[in-house]
């Protein structure tokens, strides 16, 4: 497969895809914006603490690989970045809004069940029902230019199998060690996390508005 993203590259691209949809008024993102998005505590697994220099290195690499492009001029005081990973004018990878939402959520959080994906991707795309979501996953798994996702073996204590993206190469399908977290209902946990994400984004928008009013 031609896509071989490192964990940090996947995080950066996932953040840009997410913010392009959820906070379009703040997109494209500056380096500081990408750092904040990468280190966000909601809707991220694992939570990272990347420095500006670490993020800048990833941005430079992704620009060289034509997955991102810089935006400057026309009133922009700082260089900003936008994704060319998918749905760009000259790019080969074309994804529907539903596919973008699922791929983004998998890039940001790793392997997840369909129920978890539906709750966590809701800020980007509202699936009408589980059948639509599962159909979208199957399309991503069977695309001629893919596959882009794979279904993993069901973990102990879980009712659903998880799915994982394939933009970082093949996935080792090894069940995780059973622990107390397996007793937590995945759907309920995902709903709580989705609410936390919404609150965090509303706070971010409010802070941005207050900053503009203070200028």
Curated annotation (Swiss-Prot):
Coiled coil: none annotated. The keyword Acetylation applies. It holds the Pfam family DUF480. The modification N6-acetyllysine is found at residue 80. Keywords: Acetylation. HAMAP family: UPF0502. Belongs to the UPF0502 family. This is UPF0502 protein YceH. It comes from Shigella boydii serotype 4 (strain Sb227). The gene is yceH.
């Amino acid at each position: 497969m031609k896509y071989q993203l490192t964990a940090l590259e996947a995080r950066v691209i996932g953040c840009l895809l997410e913010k392009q949809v959820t906070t379009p008024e703040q997109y494209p993102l500056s380096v500081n914006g990408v750092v904040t998005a990468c280190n966000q505590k909601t809707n991220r697994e694992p939570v990272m603490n990347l420095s500006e220099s670490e993020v800048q290195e990833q941005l430079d690499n992704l620009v060289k690989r034509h997955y991102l492009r810089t935006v400057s001029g026309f009133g922009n005081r700082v260089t900003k970045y936008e994704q060319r990973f998918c749905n760009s004018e000259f790019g080969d990878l074309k994804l529907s809004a539903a596919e973008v939402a699922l791929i983004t959520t998998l890039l940001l959080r790793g392997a997840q069940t369909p129920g978890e994906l539906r709750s966590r991707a809701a800020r980007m795309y509202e699936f009408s029902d589980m059948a639509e979501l599962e159909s979208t996953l199957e399309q991503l798994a069977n695309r001629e230019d893919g596959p882009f996702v794979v279904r993993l073996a069901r973990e102990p204590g879980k009712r659903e199998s998880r799915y994982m993206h394939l933009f970082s190469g093949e996935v080792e399908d090894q069940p995780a060690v059973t622990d107390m977290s397996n007793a937590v209902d995945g759907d309920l946990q995902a709903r709580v996390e989705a609410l936390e994400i919404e609150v965090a984004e509303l706070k971010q928008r409010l802070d941005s508005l207050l900053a503009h009013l203070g200028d």
